[in-house]
Amino acid sequence: MKNTILILLVSLVALTSCSKENNDKDNGLSRIVFDPGNLKFISNSLNPKKETMSALYGNEKALESLSKESQTPEVGAVMKLVTWKYHDNPQYIGGTITGELVSIETVQTDQSGNISYAVKDDLTESSSPDKEERIKYFMSYRPVSRP
């Protein structure tokens, strides 16, 4: 009888000690996942002053253009530069995670060689980025080396 009571008591303690709720799941931060579709990851960058991180995605033509260190994207190239605010990771000291989506910039070249630039963000009314400068910035990226 004593063994049965002891087993029940230990089981009760074990079950109740594991039911602690985690009240600060996300610390009030919203994290958005970007779906690149058929575009592949090319490179990334970090801006500590603005506390942002960016990832450059593109198709095969974009990868070829950046690998050749061209000044302009090849015909058919599509590139998207996705920028997020970053935050300290509450689960790992010294780590960062993506947070609020800041902007999605797109550069693409049509079959005639015309280069178009578009940006989606909340700040487009107050600040219009220089198209030529942004295209040069895109073309300054170097693809990460893959094993």
Each model region followed by its residue ranges:
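Sec-dependent signal peptide recognition
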Residues: 2-8
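C-terminal motif of bacterial Sec signal peptides marking the signal peptidase cleavage site
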Residues: 14-17
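Extracytoplasmic c-type cytochrome modules immediately beyond a signal peptide or single-pass transmembrane anchor
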Residues: 25-129
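The canonical Cys-X-X-Cys-His
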Residues: 76, 106, 131-146
